[in-house]
């Protein structure tokens, strides 16, 4: 099942991508941390270090921290953010 709906692109999330190696996604409400981790690793061919999740007004957000060997900016480029 595809849990990732779309990347969230704001000034804050872009700074997080550049400085902290984190990518923020809008995800399905039924998504779990493990499911998001597996989907990000499979879809973007990266290693995920950590997943934080929160419920927001517009849905559920997942903040994915990539392992140091991988670049969130590169993944963002592949998604068309940059």
Swiss-Prot record:
User: What are the record's GO terms for cellular component?
Assistant: ribonucleoprotein complex; ribosome
Record's SUPFAM superfamilies?
Ribosomal proteins S24e, L23 and L15e
GO function term, MF aspect, one: structural constituent of ribosome
Which superkingdom? Answer: Archaea
Q: Name one GO biological process term.
A: translation
Which controlled-vocabulary keywords does the entry list? Ribonucleoprotein, Ribosomal protein, RNA-binding, rRNA-binding
User: PROSITE patterns of this UniProt entry?
Assistant: RIBOSOMAL_L23
Q: Which Pfam families match?
A: Ribosomal_L23 (PF00276)
Family statement drawn from the similarity comment of this UniProt entry: Belongs to the universal ribosomal protein uL23 family.
Quaternary structure, from the entry: Part of the 50S ribosomal subunit. Contacts protein L29.
| Biological function | Binds to 23S rRNA. One of the proteins that surrounds the polypeptide exit tunnel on the outside of the ribosome.
Cited PANTHER family: 60S RIBOSOMAL PROTEIN L23A
Protein name per Swiss-Prot or TrEMBL: Large ribosomal subunit protein uL23
């Amino acid at each position: 099942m595809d849990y990732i709906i779309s990347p969230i692109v704001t000034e804050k999330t872009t700074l997080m991508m550049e400085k902290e190696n984190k990518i923020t996604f809008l995800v399905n409400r039924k998504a779990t941390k493990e499911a998001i981790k597996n989907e990000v690793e499979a879809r973007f061919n990266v290693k995920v270090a950590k997943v934080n999740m929160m419920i927001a007004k517009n849905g559920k957000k997942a903040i994915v921290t990539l392992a140091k060997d991988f670049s969130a900016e590169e993944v963002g480029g592949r998604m068309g953010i940059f």
